[in-house]
């Protein structure tokens, strides 16, 4: 019964794609980062295929200089009344932030996600190419508005390890001088509470994070601006414990 249900949902997603219209977008970027006390650069190409309509298709391709184009993420979905269904490898619902060095990040590879209203539930597969009945983990999230804030509560349960990770995200707090948000996670088995606070103003984004055993571990930020049709971004992360500053910079062109 479970095999038939999952196979039927996937077939519906594929069939619905023929009724949609798509667009292709791309970005060429020059990225620079510090490693081993030296600054190195790479040229990257990102291509996106987005289809919307009765069905949705999202394909994200990337390549670097001298390497083949690879498919990084893909999602195929459809909407049936108030019910949204998506199948792909980009359906994780745990809250994220900017640095994310101290947040628990349960793996979610290929998965089947069902959304209705503000609720999303995703079933992750161990290896969908060999057995679509082998479920590795289950994630769920609920988003609501509270006093002008966007609040998300989420959880991940791993069926193999029987571990649970709880998560929460908050955004939309306008302080006038900046907008404030953040995320937090709690790993039940590890008994670790991680958090990150993010502030944004215009093209500037700053963050700090830590956990309940070490409150301040990383401080970082990035500034992004338009330069003659291109986007320039410069940022850095400072590891407080290692006393290590890691700068980054990029110049990207969208088409």
Task: Give residue ranges: language-model regions.
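Outer-membrane beta-barrel proteins
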Residues: 1-255
């Amino acid at each position: 019964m479970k095999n038939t249900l999952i196979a039927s949902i996937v077939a519906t997603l594929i069939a619905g794609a023929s009724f949609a219209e798509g667009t292709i977008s791309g970005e060429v970027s020059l990225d620079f980062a510090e490693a081993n006390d030296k600054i190195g650069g790479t040229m990257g190409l990102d291509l996106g295929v987005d289809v919307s309509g009765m069905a949705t298709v999202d394909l994200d391709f990337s390549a670097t200089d001298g390497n083949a184009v690879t498919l990084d993420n893909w999602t195929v979905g459809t909407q049936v009344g108030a019910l949204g269904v998506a199948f792909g490898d980009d359906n994780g619902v745990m809250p994220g932030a900017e640095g994310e060095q101290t947040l628990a990040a349960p793996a979610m590879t290929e998965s089947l996600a069902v959304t209705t209203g503000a609720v999303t539930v995703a079933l992750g597969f161990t290896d969908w190419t060999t057995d679509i009945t082998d479920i590795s983990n289950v994630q769920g999230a609920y988003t609501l508005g509270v006093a002008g804030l966007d609040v998300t509560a989420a959880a991940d349960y791993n069926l193999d390890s029987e571990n649970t990770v709880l998560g929460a995200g908050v955004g939309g707090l306008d302080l006038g001088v900046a907008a404030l948000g953040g995320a937090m996670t709690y790993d039940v088995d590890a008994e670790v509470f991680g958090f990150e606070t993010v502030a944004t103003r215009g093209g500037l984004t700053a963050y700090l994070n830590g956990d309940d055993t070490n409150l301040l571990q990383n401080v970082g930020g990035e500034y992004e601006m338009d330069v003659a049709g291109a986007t320039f971004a410069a940022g850095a992360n400072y590891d407080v414990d290692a006393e290590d500053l890691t700068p980054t910079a990029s110049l990207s062109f969208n088409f």
